[in-house]
From Swiss-Prot:
Pfam families referenced in this protein's UniProt entry, alphabetically: Ribosomal_L16
Record's function text: Binds 23S rRNA and is also seen to make contacts with the A and possibly P site tRNAs.
GO cellular component terms given for this protein: cytosolic large ribosomal subunit
Subunit record text: Part of the 50S ribosomal subunit.
Organism expressing this protein natively: Erwinia tasmaniensis (strain DSM 17950 / CFBP 7177 / CIP 109463 / NCPPB 4357 / Et1/99)
Biological processes per GO annotation: translation
InterPro entries recorded: Ribosomal_uL16, Ribosomal_uL16_bact-type, Ribosomal_uL16_CS, Ribosomal_uL16_dom, Ribosomal_uL16_sf
A Gene Ontology molecular function term of the record: rRNA binding
This protein's encoding gene: rplP
Protein name, entry field: Large ribosomal subunit protein uL16
Entry's family note: Belongs to the universal ribosomal protein uL16 family.
Gene3D superfamilies: Ribosomal protein L10e/L16
Classification lineage: Bacteria, Pseudomonadati, Pseudomonadota, Gammaproteobacteria, Enterobacterales
Keyword annotations of the record: Ribonucleoprotein, Ribosomal protein, RNA-binding, rRNA-binding, tRNA-binding
Amino acid sequence: MLQPKRTKFRKVHKGRNRGLAQGTDVSFGTFGLKAVGRGRLTARQIEAARRAMTRAVKRQGKIWIRVFPDKPITEKPLEVRMGKGKGNVEYWVALIQPGKVLYEMDGVPEELAREAFKLAAAKLPIKTTFVTKTVM
Protein backbone atom coordinates (compact mmCIF):
# COMPACT_ATOMS: atom_id res chain seq x y z
CA MET A 1 0.00 0.00 0.00
CA LEU A 2 1.08 3.57 -0.64
CA GLN A 3 2.31 5.76 2.20
CA PRO A 4 5.19 8.23 2.69
CA LYS A 5 8.57 6.81 3.69
CA ARG A 6 9.03 9.60 6.22
CA THR A 7 7.20 12.77 7.18
CA LYS A 8 8.12 15.92 9.03
CA PHE A 9 5.26 15.40 11.51
CA ARG A 10 3.48 12.18 12.51
CA LYS A 11 -0.02 13.67 12.80
CA VAL A 12 -1.74 16.56 11.03
CA HIS A 13 -4.83 18.70 11.59
CA LYS A 14 -8.06 17.76 9.84
CA GLY A 15 -8.06 20.80 7.55
CA ARG A 16 -10.48 21.44 4.68
CA ASN A 17 -10.71 20.07 1.14
CA ARG A 18 -11.55 23.20 -0.85
CA GLY A 19 -10.50 24.68 -4.19
CA LEU A 20 -9.77 23.21 -7.59
CA ALA A 21 -7.25 20.50 -8.43
CA GLN A 22 -3.73 20.62 -9.79
CA GLY A 23 -2.90 17.97 -12.39
CA THR A 24 -6.07 18.19 -14.47
CA ASP A 25 -4.57 17.10 -17.81
CA VAL A 26 -3.68 13.64 -19.09
CA SER A 27 0.11 13.95 -19.32
CA PHE A 28 1.68 10.46 -19.28
CA GLY A 29 -0.76 8.12 -21.02
CA THR A 30 -3.48 8.43 -23.66
CA PHE A 31 -6.55 7.78 -21.49
CA GLY A 32 -7.34 8.93 -17.96
CA LEU A 33 -9.80 8.62 -15.09
CA LYS A 34 -10.70 12.12 -13.85
CA ALA A 35 -12.45 13.00 -10.58
CA VAL A 36 -15.73 14.88 -10.95
CA GLY A 37 -16.52 14.98 -7.23
CA ARG A 38 -14.58 15.96 -4.14
CA GLY A 39 -13.45 13.62 -1.37
CA ARG A 40 -10.65 11.48 0.02
CA LEU A 41 -9.13 8.30 -1.34
CA THR A 42 -7.51 5.90 1.10
CA ALA A 43 -4.39 3.95 0.17
CA ARG A 44 -6.50 0.78 0.12
CA GLN A 45 -9.01 2.26 -2.34
CA ILE A 46 -6.22 3.46 -4.65
CA GLU A 47 -4.67 -0.02 -4.61
CA ALA A 48 -8.01 -1.80 -5.13
CA ALA A 49 -8.76 0.33 -8.20
CA ARG A 50 -5.25 -0.26 -9.56
CA ARG A 51 -5.66 -4.03 -9.20
CA ALA A 52 -9.06 -3.95 -10.92
CA MET A 53 -7.58 -2.05 -13.89
CA THR A 54 -4.51 -4.29 -14.12
CA ARG A 55 -6.69 -7.41 -14.20
CA ALA A 56 -9.04 -5.89 -16.78
CA VAL A 57 -6.23 -5.13 -19.25
CA LYS A 58 -4.56 -8.50 -18.51
CA ARG A 59 -1.30 -6.75 -17.59
CA GLN A 60 -0.75 -5.24 -21.02
CA GLY A 61 -0.14 -1.55 -21.60
CA LYS A 62 1.04 0.80 -18.85
CA ILE A 63 -0.80 2.36 -15.92
CA TRP A 64 0.17 5.51 -14.03
CA ILE A 65 -1.18 6.40 -10.58
CA ARG A 66 -1.41 10.20 -10.36
CA VAL A 67 -2.48 10.47 -6.70
CA PHE A 68 -0.52 9.70 -3.54
CA PRO A 69 -1.92 9.32 -0.01
CA ASP A 70 0.19 11.75 2.02
CA LYS A 71 -2.22 12.72 4.81
CA PRO A 72 -2.34 10.57 7.97
CA ILE A 73 -5.77 9.92 9.50
CA THR A 74 -5.89 9.11 13.21
CA GLU A 75 -8.49 7.16 15.16
CA LYS A 76 -8.96 6.51 18.83
CA PRO A 77 -9.59 2.91 19.95
CA LEU A 78 -13.14 1.68 20.60
CA GLU A 79 -14.75 2.57 23.94
CA VAL A 80 -12.12 5.14 24.88
CA ARG A 81 -13.25 8.35 26.59
CA MET A 82 -12.73 11.71 24.92
CA GLY A 83 -9.54 13.61 25.62
CA LYS A 84 -6.16 12.09 26.54
CA GLY A 85 -4.57 13.25 23.29
CA LYS A 86 -4.93 12.60 19.59
CA GLY A 87 -5.37 8.99 18.44
CA ASN A 88 -2.92 6.80 16.54
CA VAL A 89 -2.41 6.98 12.78
CA GLU A 90 -4.66 4.29 11.26
CA TYR A 91 -4.46 4.95 7.51
CA TRP A 92 -3.34 7.43 4.85
CA VAL A 93 -5.51 9.40 2.43
CA ALA A 94 -5.14 11.58 -0.65
CA LEU A 95 -7.40 14.64 -0.79
CA ILE A 96 -9.15 14.85 -4.16
CA GLN A 97 -10.63 17.99 -5.73
CA PRO A 98 -12.80 18.08 -8.86
CA GLY A 99 -10.79 17.85 -12.09
CA LYS A 100 -7.90 15.79 -10.72
CA VAL A 101 -6.65 12.98 -12.99
CA LEU A 102 -6.40 9.89 -10.76
CA TYR A 103 -5.10 7.24 -13.16
CA GLU A 104 -3.70 7.17 -16.69
CA MET A 105 -3.33 4.33 -19.17
CA ASP A 106 -1.53 3.77 -22.46
CA GLY A 107 -0.87 0.90 -24.87
CA VAL A 108 -4.42 -0.51 -24.89
CA PRO A 109 -7.45 0.07 -27.18
CA GLU A 110 -9.94 2.74 -26.07
CA GLU A 111 -12.78 0.26 -25.45
CA LEU A 112 -10.58 -1.84 -23.16
CA ALA A 113 -9.40 1.29 -21.33
CA ARG A 114 -13.02 2.42 -20.83
CA GLU A 115 -13.96 -0.99 -19.41
CA ALA A 116 -10.92 -1.03 -17.09
CA PHE A 117 -11.64 2.49 -15.79
CA LYS A 118 -15.30 1.55 -15.25
CA LEU A 119 -14.21 -1.35 -13.02
CA ALA A 120 -11.76 0.93 -11.19
CA ALA A 121 -14.38 3.66 -10.68
CA ALA A 122 -16.65 1.14 -8.94
CA LYS A 123 -13.97 0.78 -6.23
CA LEU A 124 -13.76 4.53 -5.57
CA PRO A 125 -16.02 6.64 -3.32
CA ILE A 126 -16.05 9.67 -5.64
CA LYS A 127 -17.69 10.30 -9.00
CA THR A 128 -15.30 10.01 -11.96
CA THR A 129 -15.27 10.34 -15.73
CA PHE A 130 -13.24 8.92 -18.64
CA VAL A 131 -10.98 11.40 -20.48
CA THR A 132 -8.57 11.19 -23.41
CA LYS A 133 -5.41 13.15 -24.13
CA THR A 134 -6.04 16.32 -26.11
CA VAL A 135 -3.48 17.01 -28.86
CA MET A 136 -3.01 20.65 -29.77
